[in-house]
C-alpha cells in the first residue's frame, strides 16, 4: 500500500479541490489517504474532518514539519507520497516513480519531472505553455499515461518541490522532517541533503510528470538563514547547474572526462553524469562544506589552481569548466596555464567572466562611483576584471585558441538602449556595440 499525504495550507476551495482530486484518482481500497492541514480556514478543516475516506491531521499552530512528522508516524504504507495540494500527480506518474525507486538500490526519494537537473524539463515547458497538451483533468491523465512510458531517472543533488515519493521506513530512520524549517522548499532541500549524507541518492523519474497549479514557491528569509547556519551553504548559489555552459559541450562523447573548477555542491558535474553515466567527473572546491556534498557523486579536491601541482592529471581532461571563477583569482594567468596542461590534445576550457565593459559600469563611473556590491560585475570578492579582449588574451597566453565567444545579456530598458547608443558613438571602429550589451562573456577555447 502507498500512503498519499496531501499538504494543504489554503482555504475551503482548496480543500474541496483536494478531496475531488483524491476521490477521482486514488481509490480508498488501494491507497491510504491523509490530509495534513496547516492553514487558517476553519471551514476547510471542518470539511476535511468530515471526509470518511481520509484521516485529517490538523496542524494549525503546529507547523508543517511537525504535522507531516505526525502523518509519517501514523501512516501504514511502505511508501509514502508527500505532496503539497498545488501539485497534481496522476496515478501513472506515481507508478513511474515507484518503478524507478524499485529498480535501484538505496534510493531515498523520487520526484516527478517538474524540473530536471539541467533545467526545465520539456514536459514542464509544455504544461506552462498556452498550447499545453491538456486542458483539463482528463487530458492531464492521458498525457501522464503517455509520459509514464519513458524509462530512466536522473540524479538530483536537491529537490525544491514538495512532491516526492519515499520509503516510509527510510524517512523514519532519517528522523523525518527537520522542524527547524517552516516552509516546504527548505524542508525538501534539507531532506535531500540528509539522504545524500547517508549515501542514499535522490532521483527524478523521467516517466513521472506533475502539473503544478502555483507557479511561485514560497521562500522564507528565516528559513534561508537557518539553512546557512545548519549547512554553511547558500541556496540557490551552491546548487545551481551551469546549464548555459553545458549547452556548449558534447556530453555524449565516449570516455568523457570533465574537471570543474569551483564546483560548489557539484550540480553541474551531476548534470554531466546524468547526461553521460560513463563520464569521469572531477571537481576543485575550496569550501569544504560544499565539497562534502559534491564528493557523493564526483572526485572533488581542495586545490589552489594558481600553484597547481597534479602531475597525474596532466593530459587527462576533455573539458575544464570555469564558471565565474577567473575573476576571483590573484594570478589568473598562471592558473590558466596550469589548467591548460591538464587538457588532452584538442581538449577545451569553457570559461565565463563578468564583462567590465557593460554599460551599467560606464553609467556608474560617469556618476562618479565604482561601488562594490554583494553580487554582479562589481562583486566585492572580485580581484580581477575583464573585457572580451582581455579574456581572449588570457586564454591565448595559456596556449588556448578561442573557438566560440558568446555573451550573456540582461534586460534593457528604452533608457538603457539610448544610453548605450550614446556610448557606442564613442567606440573605436574595431570595438563593437555588443561589448556594451554583454553582461558576461563565455568562451570555449581549444588547446593548441
Question: Each predicted region: which residue ranges?
Answer:
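Short, acidic, metal-binding catalytic loop of nucleotide-sugar glycosyltransferases
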Residues: 20-30
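Glycine-rich, basic loop-to-helix element that forms the pyrophosphate-binding segment
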Residues: 59-75
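Short aromatic/hydrophobic "clamp" motif used to bind/position activated sugar donors
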Residues: 80
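Conserved donor NDP-sugar-binding/catalytic core segment of glycosyltransferases
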Residues: 92-129, 355
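A recurrent flexible, glycine/aromatic-enriched loop bordering the glycosyltransferase active site
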Residues: 135, 143-166
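S-adenosyl-L-methionine-dependent methyltransferase catalytic module, highlighting the catalytic core
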Residues: 150, 154, 179, 330-344, ...
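A short, conserved alpha-helix in the catalytic core of glycosyltransferases
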Residues: 157-175, 180-208
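Conserved N-terminal segment of class I S-adenosyl-L-methionine
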Residues: 217-315, 319, 333-336, 367, ...
